[in-house]
Amino acid sequence: MKELSSAQIRQMWLDFWKSKGHSVEPSANLVPVNDPTLLWINSGVATLKKYFDGSVIPENPRITNAQKSIRTNDIENVGKTARHHTMFEMLGNFSIGDYFRDEAIEWGFELLTSPEWFDFPKDKLYMTYYPDDKDSYNRWIACGVEPSHLVPIEDNFWEIGAGPSGPDTEIFFDRGEDFDPENIGLRLLAEDIENDRYIEIWNIVLSQFNADPAVPRSEYKELPNKNIDTGAGLERLAAVMQGAKTNFETDLFMPIIREVEKLSGKTYDPDGDNMSFKVIADHIRALSFAIGDGALPGNEGRGYVLRRLLRRAVMHGRRLGINETFLYKLVPTVGQIMESYYPEVLEKRDFIEKIVKREEETFARTIDAGSGHLDSLLAQLKAEGKDTLEGKDIFKLYDTYGFPVELTEELAEDADYKIDHEGFKAAMKEQQDRARAAVVKGGSMGMQNETLAGIVEESRFDYGADSLESNLSVIIADNERTEAVSEGQALLVFAQTPFYAEMGGQVADHGVIKNDKGDTVAEVVDVQKAPNGQPLHTVNVLASLSVGTNYTLEINKERRLAVEKNHTATHLLHAALHNVIGEHATQAGSLNEEEFLRFDFTHFEAVSNEELRHIEQEVNEQIWNDLTITTTETDVETAKEMGAMALFGEKYGKVVRVVQIGNYSVELCGGTHLNNSSEIGLFKIVKEEGIGSGTRRIIAVTGRQAFEAYRNQEDALKEIAATVKAPQLKDAAAKVQALSDSLRDLQKENVELKEKAAAAAAGDVFKDIQEAKGVRFIASQVDVADAGALRTFADNWKQKDYSDVLVLVAAIGEKVNVLVASKTKDVHAGNMIKGLAPIVAGRGGGKPDMAMAGGSDASKIAELLAAVAENL
């Protein structure tokens, strides 16, 4: 077996499959594009779903890739085991309706065992297979595999929901008896026992059925096109080929671990307690790549995942004695390890470091808040006479504040409290079940559509035409091909068309189809790409249409022009964002409609009003600069040399279109555009908002809609000016400010009057002092205008030694407001109010010294006041 670096393994994999006629699919962005079922790209096949479900036919049915992936449903196991990772690299080879079982197995065995390639010893390889899949068993035998090395496993059948499914055969490497201390042998495989002896290095999925959850597996229908989907973990291959005990001792992780040794002053011991080193090395890889791909830490979705990873890594850094910010210092090492195939980490190093460091600094403040929350929980336990910290509270510390259970346990036990481990495990399992359910839900490939996949007739989109005559070559009605149609809705393919199919954020053209008499026979309401790339026109049929007949196709020119204004403005906006807020502001989605444009981009905070003003100004300057717009067809490399930006998530063929707007913007784009920037007329941003962690959205309008937006603003300003009696529009702001200042003065005067009234009333309230359980207390109903007055009472009470506890109740409108304040450690205001509030059909809470509640039953106020003594 050859001893290869991880980079050599990856390259040899790709080279082998290229020698078998495969095209190399570049690694896709970790943030899924147009796939709401996935939080992350989590496998090599995840980016190829459109090929497997038949919605798109690839140029080459043989594909290979090395795909960066993230899975986070078992984060807590990372660092504890030899092979759990959040980010990993999946090597794959795929056949879309081309070769099948025989070639997949034969070529896989060749790659693994040939001296020209990996040169694995054949006697160290074991294969599992689905018991009913005798064809795979026989093919392995034909390759020279001993029958004793073939293990039938009932679970070797791959299916996730509806869509492509089939048996799979897995390949394992035997590391020998040293990793099997109990000498269990092949039972480890046959009974699926977790072990370190037999390492799964490759899984070959034979996708031959359309799974249907409504019928038994034996009744699944054969796919119209059988597929091969395989996955081999680079980290596992590297561990085996480099003789490493775990994946972490390979060249993918050890350089990071060495840097952590320098930062901590601790030494990594492969046989000792090294969990913290592993966690940090794993998590900083995931963070570096995910942030580089546009995801940012936040409180929801993938942003929450990144925040959790970073906080877990920071806490493990503290366990190693690293108390300052340090993770960001590891980003260059991650980039250097992966540079040969993933240069983007080093290219975006400054931005990634900035985000990681800022998040570390934020977490340092969060740790203080978490410690305060734990202190509050322990104080509450003491007040309630309890000795165990509940599992749900431990989980909240873990989930919300990033506190490892070990830290919570240590601090709680130092204060002589026990830990509810079972309750914590239950809360953790509930979260994991939700996560796994979401993963399963999102895994379906979708059913193949044989009718659409069967369209092979050629069709060409004419960029320069808004009307042309073309021959109708395909009609599909009710999901069946037909020669003619006279009513209802149908899908049409023409030899040539002026209708743009929705793509790259630009909506489809609308229009009409006319016969040779000039009569409209169909209305085009949508155009999408067929699996083989042809524009597929969705039409409402008004009169007879037949295959082989010529028709005149006319787009709605006014709609197209409006869409082109917005699309061209989108390119200008993208460039302006780069110039104003930074090159990290890359496209994360766009929509160019007739009435508006919508542009999503990566950014870690709201765009300020001043920045929006600069962006809007810059876009309009380019419109007024009368810039010529040109399109050029070339190859991807030449386009990039021209400075063209490749848009987020798009896949490009051998020939690409470059859209250049003067010297200001150069992008790869397949859409339609204006001839000159001045045709846009005017550009106005109408909204900027966050749509998720690290993603912002700008909605803007152009041309007539931009003019109307400005006119609406002017009308609103005129109305405001009239309301505040400003003599001219320019005076409106000053008049509004003057009114605001006057209102503030009146409000201040009102507060002062209320405080004086409350102070006067307090004299009577504070006279009625009672005592119970050795605690002096005041309990009274007061007549106030709002809940704020209750707090004013409490502030006055705190300034003098009237009593230890104050309870005030007020009926305000239809609501009952309750306040409890305490000066003594013997009475916890927050706990006390939880006992009182239900009496008036309310609830509330608060801190040890002050708490408030709201209720709805004013008839029970006297009962509440009478219950104060027993609730002390």
Curated annotation (Swiss-Prot):
UniProt-listed Enzyme Commission number(s): 6.1.1.7
Pfam families given in the database record: DHHA1, tRNA-synt_2c, tRNA_SAD
Catalytic activity: tRNA(Ala) + L-alanine + ATP = L-alanyl-tRNA(Ala) + AMP + diphosphate
One Gene Ontology MF term: aminoacyl-tRNA deacylase activity
GO cellular component annotations of the record: cytosol
Needed cofactors: Zn(2+)
Cofactor note: Binds 1 zinc ion per subunit.
Compartment list: Cytoplasm
Record-linked InterPro entries: aa-tRNA-synth_II/BPL/LPL, Ala-tRNA-lgiase_IIc, Ala-tRNA-ligase_IIc_anticod-bd, Ala-tRNA-synth_IIc_core, Ala-tRNA-synth_IIc_N, Ala-tRNA_ligase, Ala_tRNA_ligase_euk/bac, DHHA1_dom
CDD domains: AlaRS_core
Enzyme superclass (EC): ligase
Keywords, alphabetical: Aminoacyl-tRNA synthetase, ATP-binding, Cytoplasm, Ligase, Metal-binding, Nucleotide-binding, Protein biosynthesis, RNA-binding, tRNA-binding, Zinc
Binding site for Zn(2+): 567, 571, 669, 673
Any single GO BP term: alanyl-tRNA aminoacylation
Domain commentary: Consists of three domains; the N-terminal catalytic domain, the editing domain and the C-terminal C-Ala domain. The editing domain removes incorrectly charged amino acids, while the C-Ala domain, along with tRNA(Ala), serves as a bridge to cooperatively bring together the editing and aminoacylation centers thus stimulating deacylation of misacylated tRNAs.
Family recorded in the similarity comment: Belongs to the class-II aminoacyl-tRNA synthetase family.
PANTHER family: ALANINE--TRNA LIGASE, CYTOPLASMIC, ALANYL-TRNA SYNTHETASE
Reported function: Catalyzes the attachment of alanine to tRNA(Ala) in a two-step reaction: alanine is first activated by ATP to form Ala-AMP and then transferred to the acceptor end of tRNA(Ala). Also edits incorrectly charged Ser-tRNA(Ala) and Gly-tRNA(Ala) via its editing domain.
Protein's recorded name: Alanine--tRNA ligase
